Amino acid sequence: MKQSKWTLLWLALLPCCVWSQDQIPQTAQADQLQTSVDSLRRYGHLADPVALTDFPVPANFRHVQENVISDPDNALAPFWQKLAESQTHAISDSVRIVHVGDSHVRGHVFPLTAGDVLHQSFQSLSYVDDGINGATSLTFTTPQRVAEIVEMRPDMLILSFGTNESHGKGYNESRHYVQMSDLYQLLRESLPDVPILLTTPPGSYERGGTRRRRSYTINPRTKLAVSNILKFASEHQLAVWNLYEIFGGADRACLNWTGAGLMRPDHVHYLPEGYALQGQWLSQAIIKAFNAYVESD
């Protein structure tokens, strides 16, 4: 890949891209913006669209789909509204995204890249991540974990799970659905009005062979977990960013990533360049959705 400012970004983040668990980031303090007494709604204009940056994929990528957030029920509208008003200082609060998930989030490069891109367009926006190695949605289904999320004061909550649920051969779709439901209900008790964006896992392999001669095959359960996440999103009127399908789906996602040399030797985790690309595309999808909201006003 050609060196760019994004390559420099993940190089700077590389020391923190480790798999060991450390303390959950402390709650960030809200930034203060210039206060405006008038809402832009009063003048019939919300905010201007934001310029989009093109983030090209490696040449070997095939079957890449349109990079969009699916939100047929406009579940994210309250977040777009607040973000638009913060753009013109119609409100004095900062806007915060909290990204919760497994080791893909825990490695920091994925969420920090997304946050860096977004902050360049939205000066009021802060992006906080909370990832745990080996996590599933069940990992966060405790009063303590939810309380920690609440303390971060999210205006939008991103949930990124599915890799670990689907990694074992004992994957059960019904159990996975119940675990998603349990976490969702617990979050809704404490954060009833916070919009939630689900993401799907990027894809992984499962290991076979012997200790001397390892072999890897595409994990066939990833597509089942993805379908389950999409079903849950539809039945609970939640927005979803389908990372798996966007980068090639069952036919090409894993082949695209490995073909570009962007996966680690374990064939589950990604190199910093791979996570950086995922973060860039997540931020691009968020900006597209924001632009669609303000342009429809």
Task: List each model region and its residues.
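N-terminal secretory targeting modules
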Residues: 1-100, 104-124, 152-153, 291-297
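Alpha-helical scaffolding within the catalytic cores
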Residues: 71-86, 138-151, 178-186, 223-227, ...
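Extracytoplasmic/secreted proteins, especially bacterial periplasmic and envelope-associated proteins
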Residues: 74, 78, 109, 113, ...
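Conserved SGNH/GDSL esterase-like catalytic core that processes O-acyl groups on lipids
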Residues: 94-194, 205
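Ser/Thr-glycine-rich phosphate-binding loops at phosphate-binding pockets of nucleotides
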Residues: 103-104, 200, 271
